[in-house]
Design a protein with these regions (language model features):
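Sec-dependent N-terminal signal peptides of Gram-positive bacterial secreted proteins and lipoproteins
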Residues: 2-29, 432, 439, 443
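Short alpha-helical segments used as structural interaction elements across diverse proteins
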Residues: 4-5, 64, 295
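Domain-terminus/edge residues, biased toward the C-terminal soluble/receptor-binding domains
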Residues: 186-192, 197-451
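Generic detector of short alpha-helix boundary/capping microenvironments
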Residues: 17, 35-36, 58-59, 100, ...
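Active-site-adjacent loops and short helices of periplasmic peptidoglycan-processing enzymes
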Residues: 21, 25-196, 206-209
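Hydrophobic alpha-helical membrane context
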Residues: 19-20, 79, 302, 310
């Protein structure tokens, strides 16, 4: 009986210790978050720092998230003066017919009616109007086919890797075919991008054209208000303030749904100066849940996790000197070494409580060094000689969306003072001293060898 009690106590103690071990195990970003979608990604918006990813490099259907690329190309065309917001568009027969297809998301456009590019843009960004996307594509490139070429070219310029665009709206080609002379690609093909590429597009859209949020944040608007064509446009992003799945700080960006792509959503929200970008693609729908709720529920999960766990913190101050590398040797200078320091503070997106996991790493500019690892005078005060970056002890660091983010995680290392080149006499004396020093060292070594 006593032995049985001891055995039971031992087992209970072991279970308790194992449980404590599980509780005390350091948190892992990938392990903390489980998104129910075929692909997903979570990114900090100012740096492009990837905080979570799931199957993010595989191309998937994107449906109407396509319209972010159409928006980018339109905003670029406006910036370059090729298109004006108050420019009038006269609706041709094919676009008018498409706009009256009630099985697609649309606002009705009268044949031969005129609408401003701003009207068409807002109907596309807010209500995901497909005919409006086609109208914008024809305005910019002359045809859907030409616009698809521009989309793919821009994708390459933006550094996207796993994508293919066949139309401006994100529709399946079978739905587009009745309204164009010829579809691009297969008869039932759709646009595809990876979750990482979709996040990169959103990142570039937000950073290159932040005014996109002025429209994507509109919860409801009347199209062509005051005319016979006026139409109430509720935003398909139900997480906007005032809508049924509202989320604090939500102000964009684009939903998407087709049979091929499933329910998708690229979201962005900002609180207290911190902005995040989320992408969910082909979300899993639980019993009793509809696909609209599912994509917003998974997005909410990601954003709650991000706002609760991450912040931007200064890790290194300006004028920081790397321990053990406060100076560099200088060849042919009046001084034989020069002090170095960082020229700016270094901040990073860091998970709460993990600041100590990041250690500075000094990287010299090899082009500045001779074969002996020395700088060569003259050296100017403030001259860049390398950079400091931060390395995490965690092996699962996911990196950044773009090189811009990677570069933002570095601080230049510069010379603290100028070092002038020594005159010919000093250099000659050093050379002579070095010559006799070498002879003396040689003699010393030889003599030592006798004993």
């Amino acid at each position: 009986m006593k032995r049985s009690w001891i055995q039971k106590s031992f087992v209970c103690m072991m279970v308790f210790m194992m449980a404590m071990g599980v509780v005390q195990k350091p948190a892992n970003a990938q392990g903390d978050l489980d998104v129910n979608a075929k692909a997903a990604i979570l990114v900090e918006a100012s740096t492009g720092k990837i905080l979570y990813e799931k199957n993010s490099d595989t191309a998937q259907g994107i449906a109407s998230m396509t319209k972010m690329m159409t928006e980018y190309l339109l905003l670029e065309a406006v910036e370059e003066g090729k298109v004006k917001w108050d420019q009038k568009y006269t609706v041709p027969t094919n676009v008018s017919k498409m706009s009256h297809n009630t099985s697609l998301s649309n606002v009705s456009l009268r044949e031969e009616g005129t609408y401003t590019i701003k009207d068409l843009y807002e109907s596309m960004a807010i209500y995901s109007a497909n005919a409006s996307a086609m109208a914008i594509a024809e305005t910019i490139a002359g045809s859907e086919a030409n616009f698809a070429k521009l989309m793919n070219k821009k994708a390459e310029e933006l550094g996207l890797e796993n994508y293919k665009f066949v139309n401006s709206s994100g529709l399946n080609n079978k739905d587009l075919a009745p309204y164009v002379d010829q579809v691009v690609g297969g008869a039932e093909e759709e646009n595809v991008m990876s979750a990482k590429d979709t996040a990169t597009l959103a990142y570039r859209l937000l950073n290159d054209y932040p005014e996109v949020l002025e429209t994507s944040s509109i919860a409801k608007k009347m199209f062509a208000e005051g005319t016979e064509d006026q139409f109430n446009m509720p935003n398909w992003n139900w997480m906007l303030p005032g809508l049924i799945r509202e989320y604090e700080g939500m102000d964009g960006l684009k939903t998407g749904t087709t049979d091929f792509a499933g329910a998708c959503f690229t979201g962005t929200a900002e609180r207290d100066g911190m902005r995040f970008i989320t992408v969910v693609m082909n979300v899993d729908v639980s019993a009793g849940e509809n696909s609209y709720d599912a994509r917003f529920n998974e997005t909410r999960k990601m954003l709650d996790y991000a706002f609760a766990n991450y912040s931007i913190e200064e890790v290194l101050p300006a004028n920081y000197q790397v321990k053990g590398q406060k100076t560099l040797p200088v060849e042919k200078g009046k001084e034989k070494e020069v002090q170095i320091k960082t020229d700016s503070p270094l901040s990073m997106v860091i998970k709460n409580g993990e600041k100590d996991q990041y250690k500075p790493e000094f990287v010299l500019d090899k082009k500045k060094l001779n074969d002996e690892g020395e700088l060569t005078a003259p050296i100017k005060k403030g001259e860049k000689v390398g950079y400091v970056t931060l390395k995490s002890s965690e092996k699962n660091d996911l990196g950044y969306l773009t090189d811009k983010g990677t570069n933002a995680s570095k601080s230049s290392v510069v010379a603290v003072e100028s070092v002038e080149k020594a005159n010919w006499f000093v250099l000659s004396m050093r050379a002579v001293g070095g010559f006799f020093g070498d002879i003396w060292n040689s003699i010393t070594s030889t003599v030592k060898g006798w004993f």
